[in-house]
């Protein structure tokens, strides 16, 4: 059935818990993801790193394919003020593998701003 995967994914997102405790020591980039993020969304590596390292909100979405490597979303803001939504895999030893990034929707910006006030 078309769209059923999206509904299940939306349920996972709704039930995901915020996590402000992740410590990122290293960011892993793969060329095809860098190219896609820039071509499709106009977001640079520097902007993703800025948003990811500037006190973002994290949400664990689910288990990864490898034990101990889970899928996360990040809601962050660059120093220039751009709101960026980032998808990454939490790897071993405080490293993250960036999968995708895009501008936040208006709803995501509201969510981010509301939850940043609480932290």
Residue ranges and their predicted role:
Residues 1-119:
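Ribonuclease/tRNase effector modules and their secretory precursors
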């Amino acid at each position: 059935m078309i769209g059923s995967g999206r509904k299940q994914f939306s349920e996972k997102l709704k039930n995901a818990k915020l996590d402000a405790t992740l410590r990122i020591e290293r960011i892993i980039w793969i060329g095809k993801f860098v190219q896609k993020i820039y071509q499709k969304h106009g977001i640079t590596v520097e902007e993703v790193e800025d948003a990811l390292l500037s006190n973002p909100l994290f949400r664990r979405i689910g288990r990864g394919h490898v034990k101990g490597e889970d899928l996360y979303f990040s809601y962050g803001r660059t120093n220039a003020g751009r709101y960026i939504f980032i998808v990454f895999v939490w790897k071993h030893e405080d490293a993250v593998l960036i999968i995708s990034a895009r501008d936040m929707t208006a709803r995501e910006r509201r969510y981010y701003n509301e939850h940043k006030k609480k932290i």
